[in-house]
């Protein structure tokens, strides 16, 4: 496991593993990462409305909705993607991908740390 320093936190990285690339946690760098939700935003350039598709792996639900305005779309003008997940060190995060003028912009959002309350069998999210 590679621990990230303050400057590296939030950066989306991959490590080489037997000819494949493994996504690491954008917060701490741990390589055991699980994706729990995918959100896709389909929008024609500068259109007012877009289609938002959500596949929630933990809840076993898929939703499709028409949205007026930006909603959660990470792109202000076009299509976007948000992957939500966690690492086995407990970090919760989102990875956003947005299109802008031919570029694909990638950023992550730290959502807090999973805290296990084994006495009450609960999982709580704690921010930094």
Regions found by a protein language model. Give the residues of each.
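Short, non-ligating residues that shape and space the ligands of small metal-coordination modules
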Residues: 32-35, 93-97
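Short cysteine/histidine-rich metal-coordination sites, predominantly Zn2+-binding motifs
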Residues: 40-52, 102-111
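Short cysteine-rich clusters marking metal-coordination/redox-active sites
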Residues: 25-29, 87-89
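Short, charged low-complexity linear segments at domain edges
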Residues: 1-9, 45-70
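Short, flexible, mixed-charge glycine/proline-rich loop motifs
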Residues: 10-22, 75-81
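Structured alpha/beta or helical-core interaction and ligand-binding surfaces enriched in interleaved
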Residues: 24, 34, 39, 54-57
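Cysteine-rich micro-motifs
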Residues: 47-54, 84-92
């Amino acid at each position: 496991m590679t621990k990230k320093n303050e400057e590296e936190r939030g950066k989306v990285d991959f490590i080489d593993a037997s000819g494949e690339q493994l996504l690491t946690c954008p917060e701490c760098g741990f390589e055991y990462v699980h994706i729990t939700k995918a959100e896709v935003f389909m929008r024609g350039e500068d259109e007012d409305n877009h289609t938002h598709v959500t596949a929630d792996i933990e809840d076993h639900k898929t939703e499709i909705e028409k949205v007026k305005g930006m909603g959660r779309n990470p792109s202000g003008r076009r299509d976007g993607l948000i992957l939500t997940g966690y690492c086995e060190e407990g970090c919760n995060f989102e990875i956003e991908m947005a299109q802008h003028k031919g570029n694909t912009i990638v950023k992550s959002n730290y959502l807090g740390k999973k805290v296990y309350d084994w006495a009450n069998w609960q999982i709580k999210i704690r921010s930094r």
